[in-house]
From Swiss-Prot:
This is Exodeoxyribonuclease 7 small subunit. It catalyses: Exonucleolytic cleavage in either 5'- to 3'- or 3'- to 5'-direction to yield nucleoside 5'-phosphates. It holds the Pfam family Exonuc_VII_S. Heterooligomer composed of large and small subunits. It is found in: Cytoplasm. Its EC number is 3.1.11.6.
């Protein structure tokens, strides 16, 4: 069986890869060694990666809601992680 190409993989499956790429871009930009043009290109790519990550998280949340109550996914409460503010 052939592997899915990255372009055909679901956003949820690509989340880890997109997040890692985004983190690498941020590190490159924080060094300050990129030219203005390279910085703009990196920023544009970063925005695209951010959107992919956001879409993957939204799809994952929807899947969790559907699994929690398939009859009424809209009635489920949004997940609020516990605060670590001590």
């Amino acid at each position: 069986m052939a592997k899915k190409s990255p372009e055909n993989a679901s956003p949820v499956a690509q989340f880890e890869q997109s997040l890692e790429s985004l983190e690498q871009l941020v590190e490159q930009m924080e060094t300050g060694e990129l030219s203005l043009e390279a910085s703009l290109s990196a920023y544009e790519r970063g925005v695209g990666l951010y959107r992919q990550c956001q879409q993957a998280l939204e799809q994952a949340e929807l899947r969790v809601r559907l699994l929690s109550d398939p009859a009424q996914p809209e009635a489920s409460e949004p997940f609020d992680p516990p605060s670590h503010d001590g």
